[in-house]
Structure formats: C-alpha cells, structure tokens
A protein has these predicted regions:
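Non-catalytic alpha-helical scaffolds and adjoining flexible linkers that form interface surfaces
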Residues: 1-19, 24-237
C-alpha cells in the first residue's frame, strides 16, 4: 500500500476514543479519522499527534464522513522543537497560520516544502547565533504571501518603476524610491534583508547565511510583515 507523507497540523477528539487529524501534504489538506488514537497504549497513538511528520495509509470509509488513517510511521516528532516552550508557542502560531491559509493556496507542494523546511531548520538548529532561529518563521510568513497571491513587489519602485528603491510602503504593496516615499513608509537598511528572505530559494537560505543577518533587523521586518498581513489578508499575527 502506498504511503503518503504529511505533517499533522491539528487534531480534534472524535467519538469516544478517536481523533480527527488535519494533515498538510504536498497535495493539500487531508481530514482523517484515526481510531483508538486517544488511548496511550494504542499503536495509533504515536502517529496521530499534532506537530508530527508521518508516513501513512488511507482507507476510504463507507460509513463515516471521514476517510480513515489505517496505519502510520512517525518520520519526525520534532522533539528538540517541543522541548522549548517559547519555540513551541512560536510554531503553534505558525501552524495556525498555515492551517487557515491552506485552502487559499494553489501550489500545495511549495507550501508543504516551505513548512517542512521551517520545522526542520528549527528542530535541527545549526545556527551559531541561536537567537536568529526566529528568522525561519519569518521566512515562511514572507514566502506564504506569494503563495496567497499578495506578495510584495521588490522589483523597482512600486509607483514610478525606478530601479533605485530602498524603502518599503505597505500602502503601495512594495518598495518605493526616495522620490515616492511618504512619511508612512519604512526607510531602513533592512529592506534588502527582507528582499533576500522573500526571494531567496530555500536551498540557499542556509545556516551560514542566517547567522550573518543582524538580529536587530528581525523586529523591523516582522513589524512590516505583520502589518502587510493585516492590510492585504485581514490576518492579525
């Protein structure tokens, strides 16, 4: 039987001793019932936990509204990530964002790869500057904007198309030049870093690069990103 890889985003108690698991895969979101998964001694318990990557098999159900996860193998339980309370809370918020966004994304494969990259990078933190781990969720939030169809413009001034544009306008949806900037825009040296995090390919956003990013830039870029989500998606992060 062919196994499907996915990451469990959310679980809900179902009937007396079962769960509904909401799982992100490269093909989208699956809602599956896992029988006897509330029983600590059940073989189904380990592979039906939130924030767990699993390989699993599905059986179509004729009686229930949900298909059934009949077997599973834990690929990664992200133990290192779960040990730290602050990190876990950070990821919990990220999981909620991905869960709310997934039905509005067309490229599920890219979303899955992005989420998988983020969890793996944080769980196996290889950064010398450990505090910079906060940049990984920021990378996901920035790249998710593109997948949701509201990505900011970094290719020249959003107003006049000039190439020399180093400020960011939330109102205009991208970078602006010195001639088009307003008092409401962000003129900061960190816009270039924001562009790298947004446009950079995942295989290029390696620990060596993340180590070099000034920690002070995080607060500025996160503020811009959060306000951007609120304006264009009505999502308050």
């Amino acid at each position: 039987m062919e196994l499907i890889e996915g990451i469990i985003l959310k679980t809900i108690k179902y009937q007396e001793n079962s769960k509904l698991c909401y799982i992100i895969t490269k093909d989208g979101l699956l809602s599956l019932m896992v029988r006897a998964s509330l029983d600590f001694h059940s073989k189904n318990f380990s592979y039906s936990q939130e924030l767990t990557k699993v390989d699993f098999a599905i059986t179509k159900s004729k009686k229930n509204s949900f298909d059934i996860m009949t077997s599973g193998i834990v690929v990664d339980s992200y133990l290192n990530l779960k040990k730290d309370y602050d990190t876990l809370m950070m990821i919990t918020k990220l999981m909620d964002l991905v869960y709310k966004s997934i039905n509005y994304v067309n490229n599920f494969d890219n979303l899955y790869k992005l989420f998988d990259y983020t969890l793996d990078a944080i769980n196996n933190n290889k950064l010398e500057t450990k505090d910079n781990v906060v940049f990984y969720p920021l990378i996901l939030k920035l790249k998710l904007l593109y997948l949701l169809g509201v990505g900011p413009n970094f290719n020249g001034c959003t107003v006049c198309k000039r190439e020399n544009a180093h400020a960011f306008s939330i109102e205009r949806g991208g970078v602006v030049c010195d001639k088009c900037i307003t008092i409401f825009d962000y003129k900061t040296e960190y816009i270039g870093i924001m562009k790298i995090l947004y446009l950079g390919k995942l295989d290029k956003l390696v620990p060596e690069l993340i180590n070099e990013i000034p920690r002070a830039s995080f607060q500025v870029i996160e503020e811009i990103t959060n306000k951007y989500y609120e304006k264009y998606l009505s999502i308050k992060l």
